[in-house]
């Protein structure tokens, strides 16, 4: 979540200019080489010239640009009633099983702005004098201190990151999921990954402390006159922590911090990297998007431009090596310059190429950060979503990742995250236009802005195929844009479930890269119809048969897919046949399907849907599979293999050819 600033800064920007009331501790991301970013008002954060303006008051979308198409106002998701827990709901192909509300310690717990917990939350966010912020804005702002963020999974446990710490759930029975452990440890965003007995957590905000204690640091003085838009960084603190925390979770009810690796820009997100050739260590790619801290606080940190300091902390990621037998010895082992121009050696070798803005095309800006990196070790590649660019990395040597391709797009405002198709032949990038706080799915918001961009990948080169955006128009008070998702392991298809903040959850089929389609969804009405309150689905991931979503304001949602004309029960059952021991979405692992007949039935359904085989052959296949299931008669199955292989060589559809070959392989040697 971010574009040019952390969400904390975006929420508080208008309060700075209206009242000059909080410290620079919440200053954050920069998408330019400037060492200290300047707030950029968005439609939700109005210019200071509008005296008394409320930055949370929704604004209608500007006119749709010529030649662009917006979202569908006729969709049932566009007319849902508002509310925190009583909001209207709409769903297709998804059943909502339960919502586990946030634990009390991770909620404001009061609608009274003067409540001590509300005031403490504002202090954590760097507000020096809350009395100068209107009461309604105080509540909306304070909620950020307890925002849910990303998810990770291991065995029967789900790890839910939060700006205030981590919550661990027992999901051994998804219908009876329950909270096991709450660990208070502020610092935001709190993105998490897990490997064996280790839990990793990203910390970026300046309220993080080495010992995880929640008191933060005293807010600094208000910015001096003329510095409201570019306040100084917070005063150096020896106990401040910004980087990656490492916990030992051998005792799941009592995590112990065993290491804390400091970085110059903190860790907005991180990526767990497992080297198949190295059994003794794991690696962490750290994506820092926040301001560069002072060298007085962490030696060697510099936020200067490359021409002033070639050792600048900008224009790089950090790689942490974690010895599995001695995680307390974790340390940064390299800081790759992923954006370097190989011809000139210039660190700022990539730029956005220009993007869209309120007043038309904006000038290109240098890319100096990655927001998120997804590694796919099975193919030795990673896809980086890096502010102004999407990049492709060779990670065969995980300590020294090398950029091998890069793309940009004038329709993209901020390259946010990436996912590979299972065969590694496609990459889905997301654009977080509006930084996650903006309402960007309104009827007049173009469906190429704040969308997914699907690229084909061949010979280590990316080529654009199409866009996909949530098709349903959302309201002016609903923050909505493309966000985090994962593959759904339906064999024979490329399907991704994805979070869209208050746009809900959308399931996209991108098997045909040029024509992606929505096949399922779930959505709620706005939290507040009159105020843009940060909420909705941060992440939506498939894990061992269910969909889990971190709802920013409400808690943990659990879903299951249901059959429709777009997805059969056999396809859902085949996806459920895939079981994994752990899941960290940025560390993508190859999906392998068992040679079970339920998987064969899914392929048959797909071949019927695409009309790749005539009806009589579909009927023969189903009859043979049924006989094998009920009477263990395998002879008929094997007799069908030659004709399937022949059809695979004749069909013009690459997808159907792959399905036919996979089906033939199962029928030849089914696992009963």
Feature roles, as predicted:
Residues 571-672:
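Soluble extracellular-acting proteins and domains
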Residues 20-21, 425, 671:
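Hydrophobic alpha-helical elements and their junctions with loops/disorder across both membrane
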Residues 2-13:
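Bacterial N-terminal signal peptides that target proteins for export
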Residues 29-603:
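Feature marking well-ordered beta-strand scaffolds used for ligand recognition
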Residues 24-28:
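Sec/Tat signal peptide C-region and signal peptidase I cleavage site
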Residues 11-23:
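Bacterial N-terminal signal peptides
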